[in-house]
Swiss-Prot record:
The gene is RMI2. It is found in: Nucleus. Phosphorylated during mitosis. Coiled coil: none annotated. The modification Phosphoserine is found at residue 7. Component of the RMI complex, containing at least TOP3A, RMI1 and RMI2. The RMI complex interacts with BLM. GO terms for molecular function: DNA binding. This is RecQ-mediated genome instability protein 2. Belongs to the RMI2 family. The modification N-acetylalanine is found at residue 2. The keyword Phosphoprotein applies.
């Protein structure tokens, strides 16, 4: 039996390495303001709370589709806008690339400035339940305050 690997690969012209660790839930503003590094090595600075940076191998973001086309979408969460690329290659279930739909996107960060940009791994329509949207900002805040404050989260240990 083969040894487990750190990631899976999605084949294609712009292959994405999928991490084995769960995605970190973030808001667009957190990435704009606190992300350090570059593609493949992004970290979320937590110096303001006296913690080591949080490794961002993959992120989970939610937002409303503002515009979409050609495998690219622009979304908006409570803190600002972000872009998602590679949507033509990801499973999405029901059609959700329609302006006004509320979706979740799991992906790998490509850029954080001037606005976050993800290479999509998964997208799901969450529009049927308005609680997803109304609670998202509080959920992210709570996770960062209580769960992601643990020293081993995001380190791959």
């Amino acid at each position: 039996m083969a040894a487990p690997t750190d990631s899976l690969s999605v084949s294609g012209p712009t292959a994405v390495r999928l991490p084995r660790s769960p995605p970190i839930k973030v808001l667009a503003e957190q990435l704009r303001r606190d992300a350090e590094g570059g593609p493949g090595s992004w970290r979320l600075s937590r110096a303001a709370v006296g913690r080591e940076p949080l490794e961002l191998r993959a992120v989970w973001m939610q937002g409303t589709v503002v515009e979409a086309g050609g495998g690219v979408a622009r979304l908006r969460d409570p803190s600002g806008s972000f872009s998602v690329r590679g949507l033509e290659r990801v499973p999405r279930g029901r059609p959700c690339l329609v302006p006004g739909k509320y979706v979740m996107v799991m992906g790998v960060i490509q850029a954080c400035s001037p606005e976050p940009c993800l290479q999509a791994v998964k997208m799901t329509d969450l529009s049927d339940n308005p609680l997803h949207e109304s609670l998202w900002e509080l959920e992210v805040e709570d996770l960062h305050r209580h769960i992601y404050s643990l020293d081993d989260v995001g380190t791959g240990d």
